[in-house]
Amino acid sequence: MGGYGMTDKMRELTDGQMQEFVKVLEKRRVPLHSVLIAQHGKLIFEKYYAPYCRNKLQRMFSVTKGFTSLAIGLLEQEGKISLQDHICDYFPEYLPGRVHPWLAEMTIENMLKMQTCYNMTTYNKTSTTENWVRSFFQTEPTHRPGTLFMYDTSSSHVLCALVEKLTGEKMLDYLKEKMLRQIGFSEESYIIEDPFGTSMGGSG
């Protein structure tokens, strides 16, 4: 609690403190690509580790999940979806002949919270023949949605597919148009696609 109430001047980080912080990370063998520290809206420290550098694009992996959630939030704000909508209603083309009740019950909100009806990621990232979105609906459910948290990349991937289906454009292009461009987000950025052309909204 001692940190509360301190003035901005008292909280200024020194170069020595930042260097010491980096040394601790390196000593603990944290796999680093780069270290950037900002204070009061300004970048005050940066260090890169080969082969990474300031001007080299880096894959952000699961950070992409946050962008997918943002896009879903914007669609809800626009009135195009409700978080209580059932995800099956948007992908009838991928549904099995008999839809399991737990799958039919699953909502967009369940997926955002990673409380789907699966206890595993449903797609095989090494497969070039099984559609990653389709596999989400073809996999046998393991439990009722909303009852169990399970960190899952496939739910974010399907939500990204939903964004692209409803907007008719790549998810990152949609986000750039709606808000990212206004805050100076990199125009060079892109999201890797799965073998079937859907942006990898959970790991790209």
Where are these regions (language model features)?
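Short, basic/aromatic recognition patches
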Residues: 7-26
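Catalytic nucleophile serine of serine hydrolases
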Residues: 62-63, 150-153
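Active-site helix/loop module of the DD-peptidase/beta-lactamase fold
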Residues: 78-116, 138, 167-204
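Glycine/charged-rich beta-loop-alpha catalytic/anionic-binding loops adjacent to active sites
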Residues: 47-56, 137-145, 194-197
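Active-site SXXK
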Residues: 41, 59-84, 111, 159-163
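Amphipathic alpha-helical interface segments
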Residues: 128-146, 155
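Short, Lys/Arg-enriched N-terminal segments with co-localized hydrophobic residues
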Residues: 1-5
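A short, well-structured edge-of-sheet supersecondary motif
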Residues: 22-53, 83
